[in-house]
Amino acid sequence: MAKKNLIVGQSGGPTAVINSSLYGVVSEGLTHPDTIEHVYGMVNGIEGFFNDHILDFEEALPGDKLKWLTHTPGAYLGSCRYKLPESLEDPVYPALFKKFEELNIGWFFYIGGNDSMDTVSKLSRYAERIGSPIRVIGEPKTIDNDLVHTDHTPGFGSAAKYVASTVREITTDANVYEKKSVTIIEIMGRHAGWLTAASALARKYDGDNPLFIYLPEVAFDQDVFLKDLEKAFEKNCNLIVCVSEGIHDADGTFICEYDSSVGTDTFGHKMLAGCGKYLENLVRSRLGVKARSVELNVSQRCSASLISATDQKEAITAGKFGVQAALNGETGKMVSFIRQTDSEGNYQMVCGLEDVNAICNEEKTVPLTWITSDGHNVTEDFIRYARPLIQGNIEVPLGEDGLPKFVYRK
């Protein structure tokens, strides 16, 4: 059989282990020289591919350099937020597949979240329509953990570890003074509160901070919120409150919109930020206590020093599994994670495949049964779910300047 080439791209927001998934795809691809002639990378995703921004991994990351991907945050190949047309009749599709043919592409991999799986769906359906032999596989990625039909996603474990660690550190800082204070920590999560829920992992004992966790799965009432804080001050001096950026009221209005209007991105998603600052001002004006807000922002997804070893290992495994599946003829699928336990009840994960058409444009939220009846905490079921995903540390090599050594695209 004539050799063909493999191409891989990254899309959407990066994570601390999206490059580990990339390493898994590339390293596995390079172990099949009898079948795969070249392993290419799309610089800036499908948008860069349109503009012929392509690299050959054997030239770009020779030898041991490839392994450096596993401790480098960000997206080595760069990213994009390009949305393919809904209609498969659009001329963009034949133009794309002409480029695939010119590059002798046999396998296409896209590492990303919900919108990226939409791209995988469209390309695989168009390939089937025209009888193209190209195999199209989606590799999951998102710190939001909101992809359906998978136990969890690569990137969530490391982001959850960062959130829990940072919340514990902020709690330690807030406890310095014996003066009533409220610290509000705003955490990423538009409609799904998985990452904010992970702040519960910071607690060292029952009743420890963060005392309040507000997720977008439950409507937020600012008057009830203020009453809850007043009651908590009867027993606690310093209160830590963790909120998802996407918390909203019963009418569906985002709390961040109380203070200002918000724009939208290329996919029509509202660009949320600022609910923490709004609540800070609310607490200060209504309760008359010291208030501070902290927005974790992009640091949640780019902390190499707190990469979960479990997350990294699973991301690499997913990348390798996807290549093996594609070589076996699979297409139009996303690699999924299936949770299992060994004979002693310890956490294990195995990979599976799911129809990408059942995944794209769907969203997995935190089950309401994992949120307490008062709406501002999570249950032990969530703790048991999330704790295995943050386990283990990795060693990040340091340079002569004492700072982490990452690999960069030239």
What positions do the PLM features span?
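Glycine-rich oxoanion-binding loops at beta->alpha junctions
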Residues: 52-106, 115, 154-156, 168
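Glycine-rich beta-alpha junction loops
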Residues: 43-47, 141-145, 187-192, 216-222, ...
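C-terminal non-catalytic interaction/assembly regions of soluble proteins
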Residues: 256-410
